[in-house]
Structures are given as C-alpha cells and as structure tokens.
C-alpha cells in the first residue's frame, strides 16, 4: 500500500498549479456506515507524524515556575495563572487565541482553572490542553506536539487533516498518510470498512484518490 500512497502523493504535487506560496498537502477522508450523531462514533485523535507536518505548529503552555522557564525555549507562548484569569474575563481575546493556536499544554494543577475560565471556548474546538504531569518533560512534550496533527470528524462524514508540505519528499508525506490510515483503521468500529474513500491534495491543487 505504501507505493500506492506515494504514487498518489506524487501525482497530487505534480498536478498542482504553481503558486507563489508554500502549499500544504492535505488528506481528505470520507467515512461510511457510521452514525456520527453518536459522539462515540466520531473520530478525535492526535497523531504524531513520523516526517513532521512540514509547517510550524503553534503551541501555548500554561505553566509556572521552572516548567514555565523551560517552556519558553520551545513554546510559542507561555501563560501564567494570572494571564489565564485575564483571558477568562476577555472572551474576544480567548476566542482569538483558541483559533490561532494548534495545541495547548498545561500543568495538571492548572487544568481545573482552565476548565473554569476557558472550557466553553476550548472545549467545542477540541482544544482542551494536554495535561502535563509532574514527571513529564515540558520540552519533550512540546517537541512531540510540533509533529502532531489532530484528526477530527465531528458530525461530518468528510474531514481533512494536514499531512505535509508541497516541498517535502513524496515518500515522507506517504509515511505520514500511512500512519494516519493505520490509526483510523484501529479506531473506527469496523476498521477499513468504515472508510469510503481518501484523497490527497495540495492547498489549491486537484484531489488524487488514494487506492484502498
């Protein structure tokens, strides 16, 4: 299957018109035979891509003390408890942050306050923070999340996720696609039988089907 994925990725990149910006490569997945009105059937998975996403991933860490100091070297923003409370009083700023940031990480001790101040904003977006336990290394956690994508169907049968960038090697992108397909097959109730079709495409290019 790896060769067929690589062929599809290569075609998608080769057939894409030349643009004056760096395009991403996305995977579109069409599901079937699932009642997505039932939340238990929806896809909501974090997947670490072996070749990386090909783009910068925006990450915010909620932390204090030594953890906050270490996070400053790797995270895009580090927010304290006081700044969290300020966001809780400013819905517009909180919504802007939630829309701009890909992933949030928080010390476990701050999760209750995050739920209180930002739960209604982050929750529906599927962006509640990953809890950071006392023994967890914040640098390792953030570095891992730099190569992570969230695959989320919500109630839709068709959903998309980023699998790379146009200037990445086709085989690297294919490795990313393969990891996502394997995760989907392991997660879905009927495995591959719940996948109707899959396509890869650049941001502005044509869709190329990935053979089953």
Swiss-Prot record:
Protein's name according to its UniProt entry: Large ribosomal subunit protein uL1
Alphabetical GO biological process terms: regulation of translation; translation
Matching NCBIfam families: PRK04203.1 (NF003244)
Pfam families: Ribosomal_L1 (PF00687)
Keywords: Repressor, Ribonucleoprotein, Ribosomal protein, RNA-binding, rRNA-binding, Translation regulation, tRNA-binding
Function of the molecule: Binds directly to 23S rRNA. Probably involved in E site tRNA release. Protein L1 is also a translational repressor protein, it controls the translation of its operon by binding to its mRNA.
GO molecular function list: rRNA binding; structural constituent of ribosome; tRNA binding
GO CC aspect terms: large ribosomal subunit
PROSITE patterns: RIBOSOMAL_L1
Oligomeric and partner information: Part of the 50S ribosomal subunit.
Family annotation (InterPro entries): Ribosomal_uL1 (IPR002143), Ribosomal_uL1-like (IPR023674), Ribosomal_uL1/biogenesis (IPR028364), Ribosomal_uL1_3-a/b-sand (IPR016095), Ribosomal_uL1_arc (IPR023669), Ribosomal_uL1_CS (IPR023673)
UniProt similarity note: Belongs to the universal ribosomal protein uL1 family.
Keyword Repressor listed: yes
């Amino acid at each position: 299957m790896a060769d067929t994925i690589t062929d599809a990725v290569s075609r998608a990149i080769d057939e894409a018109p030349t643009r004056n910006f760096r395009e991403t490569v996305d995977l579109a997945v069409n599901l079937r035979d699932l009642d997505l009105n039932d939340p238990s059937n929806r896809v909501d998975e974090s997947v670490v891509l072996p070749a990386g996403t090909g783009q910068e991933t925006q990450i915010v860490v909620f932390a204090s003390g030594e953890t906050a100091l270490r996070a400053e070297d790797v995270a895009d923003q580090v927010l304290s408890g006081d700044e969290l409370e300020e966001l809780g009083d400013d819905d517009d700023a909180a919504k802007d942050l939630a829309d701009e940031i890909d992933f949030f990480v928080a010390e476990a001790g701050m999760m209750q306050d995050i739920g209180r101040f930002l739960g209604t904003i982050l929750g529906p977006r599927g962006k509640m923070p990953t809890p950071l336990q006392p023994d967890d290394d914040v640098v390792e956690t953030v570095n891992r999340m730099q190569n992570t994508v969230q695959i989320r169907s919500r109630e839709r049968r068709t959903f998309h996720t980023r699998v790379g960038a146009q200037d990445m090697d086709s085989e690297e992108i294919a490795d990313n696609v393969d990891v996502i397909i394997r995760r989907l097959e392991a997660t879905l109730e009927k495995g591959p039988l719940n996948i109707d079709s899959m396509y890869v495409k650049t941001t502005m290019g044509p869709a190329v089907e990935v053979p089953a």
